[in-house]
């Protein structure tokens, strides 16, 4: 037997500890790190963490001076080896490469970070600022500058929208009719509200409320079916179920009954005026139940100057009327599921054509065209909203032969009650029969940015103020004001002061 390498007396025996002899099992304890991998063959070892000690800047400068000094360079060029001689030129090139490598290592490459990661700067001054327009994709881990460029490091947050109504008023007697216009907001911050036969005026700044008729409202014309302020905000026109249209001056003192009524406009055979739109210079456009659209010049006694109807017009109620900002076009929506765009350049004068053909007819809605609006911040964009069984808003480009730009599915359980455009934020607001207000951004995708439940009942009316507030009227007979487009009042160019000498000569 070969007993080489064994101690005397250990041949054929197994050495056991006293604990094993007594039947005890020794608990495995943690072991300290070791370089002997044979003890733990299945273990995975990680290299020791090295903490480098950075020298002072003075010592680094001194070392750099020694490497770049002329004396060091001369010594480096000497050949002191006993092997193959080296030329001074070759040694000089190798020494220069070594110096450049050591210099690079001594100035910032001592970490595992990438070149783009700005971790530490071993200079007395901060790193030089990047060039204008440069987008740095590096991760800024540490910075001594408290001000960071927000364009590259701070994510732009979406604006906050206040989803609760700022003012809520009761509107007893608000007619539950989806195809009548009960509200309008004038340019001098007066809101006109039709409650049955009465008309109330409410100033949203002073909270003053007054009755236009002072409990002597005319009842022989039926219910009020449409309300509209003139463009300069001095006169208000009311359409009635009988087809009559009355013009009032709210600022005129009431000394006798109906003295605030300036005149009444009637058209033979017309009934139920549900839509009114004012132009400049005293021209008022009215839509009737018969489908006819009549242009009235309120400054002259023979007020009917032109009409759009007949075989080229609508065959049912005209429910929406709006003029473009330049007054070259007028859009009308009807219960016959069509919207027509009319040429507004020949409304009055010698060039008037009675019952002309419309410029374009939109017939892609599956329900009544309940609302229509020209975009206030993007020229040439028209929005039409469908009624019951439609629930869509369709956007049209009038400059491209009324090509459809986008179709938005606003409401699946009802129609669209109103459309308001907001210029400061370039957004579109819609109200629908499901009680929701929806804000869409006018970008490439027309993205839905906010959805607000404004009511538990269908919203019948949606109007916007000249100061970026909105007012809704719902079937709960309530009026609610929302501040969805708050802007800095110091930058608001609109003047809230009403001009004193602006008006029309209404005969």
Swiss-Prot record:
Disruption phenotype: RNAi-mediated knockdown causes embryonic lethality. Embryos are arrested at the metaphase-anaphase transition of meiosis I and lack formation of polar bodies. In addition, causes a loss of asymmetric cell division and par-2 mislocalization in the one-cell embryo followed by an arrest at the one-cell stage. Keywords: Cell cycle, Cell division, Chromosome, Cytoplasm, Meiosis, Mitosis, Repeat, WD repeat. One of its GO terms (cellular component) is anaphase-promoting complex. Its main location: nucleus. WD repeats lie at residues 219-258, 313-352, 364-406, 411-450. GO terms for molecular function: anaphase-promoting complex binding; ubiquitin ligase activator activity. Changing residue 433 to N: In h1983; reduction in the number of eggs laid. Residues 1-39, 74-95 are annotated as: Disordered. It is found in: Chromosome; Cytoplasm. One of its GO terms (biological process) is metaphase/anaphase transition of meiosis I. Residues 15-24, 74-86 have a biased composition (Polar residues). Belongs to the WD repeat CDC20/Fizzy family. Plays a role in metaphase-anaphase transition during meiosis I. Required for embryonic anterior-posterior axis formation. This is WD repeat-containing protein fzy-1. It comes from Caenorhabditis elegans.
């Amino acid at each position: 037997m070969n007993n080489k390498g064994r101690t005397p007396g250990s041949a054929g025996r197994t050495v056991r500890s006293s604990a094993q002899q007594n039947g005890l099992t020794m608990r495995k304890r943690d072991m300290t790190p070791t370089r002997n991998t044979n003890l733990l063959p299945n273990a995975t070892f990680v290299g020791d963490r090295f903490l480098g000690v950075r020298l002072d800047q003075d010592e680094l400068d001194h070392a750099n001076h020694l490497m770049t000094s002329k004396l060091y360079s001369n010594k480096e060029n000497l050949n002191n080896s006993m092997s193959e001689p080296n030329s001074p030129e070759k040694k000089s090139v190798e020494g220069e490469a070594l110096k450049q490598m050591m210099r690079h290592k001594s100035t910032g490459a001592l970490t595992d970070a990438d070149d783009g990661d700005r971790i530490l700067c071993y200079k007395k001054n901060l790193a030089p600022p990047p060039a204008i327009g440069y987008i740095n994709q590096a991760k800024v881990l540490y910075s001594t500058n408290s001000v960071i460029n927000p364009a590259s490091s701070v994510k732009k947050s979406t604006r906050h929208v206040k989803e609760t109504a700022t003012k809520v008023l009761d509107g007893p007697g608000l007619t539950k009719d989806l195809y009548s216009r009960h509200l309008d907001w004038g340019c001098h911050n007066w809101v006109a509200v039709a409650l049955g036969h009465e008309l109330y005026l409410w100033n949203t700044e002073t909270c003053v409320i007054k009755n236009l008729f002072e409990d002597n409202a005319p009842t022989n014309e039926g219910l009020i079916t449409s309300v509209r302020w003139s463009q300069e905000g001095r006169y208000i026109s009311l359409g009635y179920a009988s087809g009559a249209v009355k013009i009032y001056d709210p600022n005129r003192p009431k000394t006798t009954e109906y003295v605030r009524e300036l005149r009444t406009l009637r058209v033979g055979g017309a009934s139920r005026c549900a839509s009114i739109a004012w132009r400049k210079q005293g021209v008022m456009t009215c839509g009737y139940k018969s489908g006819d659209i009549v242009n009235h010049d309120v400054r002259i006694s023979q007020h009917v100057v032109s009409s759009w109807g007949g075989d080229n017009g609508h065959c049912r109620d005209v429910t929406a009327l709006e003029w473009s900002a330049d007054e070259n076009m007028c859009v009308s929506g009807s219960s016959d599921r069509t919207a027509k765009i009319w040429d507004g350049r020949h409304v009055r004068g010698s060039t008037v054509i009675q019952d002309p053909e419309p410029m374009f007819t939109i017939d892609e809605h599956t329900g009544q065209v309940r609302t229509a609006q020209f975009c206030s911040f993007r020229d040439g964009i028209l929005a039409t909203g469908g009624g019951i069984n439609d629930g869509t808003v369709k956007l049209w480009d009038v400059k491209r032969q009324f090509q459809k730009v986008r179709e938005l599915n606003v409401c699946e359980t009802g129609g669209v009650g109103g459309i308001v455009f907001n210029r400061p934020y370039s957004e579109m607001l819609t109200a629908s029969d499901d009680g929701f207000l929806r804000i869409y951004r006018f970008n490439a995708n027309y993205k839905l940015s906010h959805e607000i439940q404004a009511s538990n009942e269908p919203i019948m009316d949606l109007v916007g103020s000249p100061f970026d507030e909105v007012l809704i009227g719902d079937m709960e007979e309530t009026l609610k004001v929302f501040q969805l487009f708050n802007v800095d009042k110091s930058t608001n160019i609109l003047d809230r002061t009403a001009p004193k000498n602006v008006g029309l000569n209404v005969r």
